């Protein structure tokens, strides 16, 4: 899975989670890999 795909999946999941629960998830699983809050925020801030 390419980083662009990982970033897109994280973004979709995080937006939906925030929309329904009002806060960002503690962690996100993408492609059988679990990313912590710090890790997925780093990925979302990357310029690709």
Show which residues each predicted segment covers.
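Acidic, low-complexity, intrinsically disordered interaction modules
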Residues: 2-48
């Amino acid at each position: 899975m390419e980083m662009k795909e990982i970033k897109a999946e994280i973004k979709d999941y995080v937006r939906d989670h925030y929309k329904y629960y009002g806060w960002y998830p503690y962690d996100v699983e993408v492609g059988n890999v679990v990313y912590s809050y710090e890790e997925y925020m780093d990925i979302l801030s990357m310029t690709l």
